[in-house]
Amino acid sequence: MSNEEIKNKDEQLQQDAVETEAEVVGTDADIDWNQAADEIDEKEAKIAQLEAALLVSEERVKEQQDSVLRARAEVENMRRRSEQEVDKARKFALSRFAEELLPVIDNLERAIQAADGEVEAIKPLLEGVELTHKTFVDTIAKFGLKEINPHGEVFNPEFHQAMSIQESAEHEPNTVMFVMQKGYELNGRVLRPAMVMVSK
């Protein structure tokens, strides 16, 4: 064998070795590439799964927040309703109590009107009844009881009850000429309308 043949053979062997090595590296690269692609697919699937779980969790959080807001609103409404019911019950109980006291006020006023203030023996008694009446009226006024004494006012059927109607040249038509019995209201609600005589 000549040098040239040996040289060609050597080159051929080197080229075969390079090709074989390239094939081996290519195969390893294919294996690494396939493994990397599989790992990427697994990670993408895991990411998709985690994103889906996150969306479900976010929906649950929104539902819980809505639920909490509704519960708070319901509690606030219940608190407000119970306060109103307690207030109504208190006012109703107070109105029944006040209605029972109205005849006492009427009787004290009748006693004051009937007493003759000119008689010396009755003056101390009259002063005591007047003081009792004033104290009594002031005390119940603290709880919202107001007197309805519409003398000279225009007749209002919400607050007045017409007992009679008379012609009068001195008064405008539909005016209260005389109050037979005072009316009372408690916290804006009429307990007893004033009994009045109205001009025609």
From Swiss-Prot:
Region entry Disordered: which residue ranges?
Answer: 1-30
Q: Output the Gene Ontology terms for molecular function.
A: adenyl-nucleotide exchange factor activity; protein homodimerization activity; protein-folding chaperone binding; unfolded protein binding
- Which one GO biological process term can you cite for this protein? protein folding
Q: Where in the cell is it found?
A: Cytoplasm
TM region positions: none
Q: Which Pfam family, any one of them, does this sequence belong to?
A: GrpE
Q: Locate the coiled-coil region(s) and give their ranges.
A: none
| PROSITE patterns linked to this entry | GRPE
Q: Specify the superkingdom.
A: Bacteria
List where Basic and acidic residues composition bias occurs. 1-12
Name where it mostly resides: cytoplasm
What are its GO cellular component terms? Answer: cytosol
What keywords sit in the KW lines?
Chaperone, Cytoplasm, Stress response
The answer to whether the entry has keyword Chaperone is yes
Q: Check the record and name the NCBIfam families matching this protein.
A: PRK14139.1, PRK14140.1, PRK14150.1
Provide the assembly information.
Answer: Homodimer.
Q: What does the record give as the function of this protein?
A: Participates actively in the response to hyperosmotic and heat shock by preventing the aggregation of stress-denatured proteins, in association with DnaK and GrpE. It is the nucleotide exchange factor for DnaK and may function as a thermosensor. Unfolded proteins bind initially to DnaJ; upon interaction with the DnaJ-bound protein, DnaK hydrolyzes its bound ATP, resulting in the formation of a stable complex. GrpE releases ADP from DnaK; ATP binding to DnaK triggers the release of the substrate protein, thus completing the reaction cycle.
Give the family per the record.
Belongs to the GrpE family.
What is the protein name given in its UniProt record? Answer: Protein GrpE
Native source organism of the sequence = Vibrio cholerae serotype O1 (strain ATCC 39315 / El Tor Inaba N16961)
What are the leading ranks of the lineage?
A: Bacteria, Pseudomonadati, Pseudomonadota, Gammaproteobacteria, Vibrionales
